[in-house]
Amino acid sequence: LSKLPDYDYEGTGEYAWFTQNCYKYGFILRYPEGKESITAIQYEPWHFRYVGLPHAYYIMQNGLCLEEYIDLVRQHPYGSDPLTFTDENGKNYEVYFVASDDGNETTSIPVPAGIKYEISGNNADGFIVTVYKDEPVTAEPATEAPTEAETETVPEDTAQDVPAEQ
């Protein structure tokens, strides 16, 4: 077993830079000081979570914890006014919520055509869609399938049960 570091991370001193700049890399301080009544967890200066660049930026700029941010996004369901903002680099984002289809194995999530987007489950009741308004989707070059994957051999006695490839 490896030995654990023999120090406490308080997010101060030489570590203050990470705490102050983590949002630029998509991280947030998961349990910030002063949000204990909302998170139900005491302040943990060492506990960071990756949420993605746009979300980390918004959370940091608005002094929110993750629970507050998720509640805010729920107030912007698809079809209503999305949460829109511009980050410090001038990039524009649109964020909206899509509730999961209770009882179904799948949920249809409306997304924009031709613009980069990401979908993330909120681990509770739905999905957060992030639209990168300034980033059109570019067609990626097709990759060639390995030769062994180009054809499939089906036993003759089951061939009638297999739909023909189109």
Give the residues covered by each predicted segment:
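Ser/Thr/Gly/Pro-rich low-complexity, disordered linker/stalk segments of secreted
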Residues: 138-166
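Cell-envelope/glycan interface and biosynthesis
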Residues: 1-86, 90-137
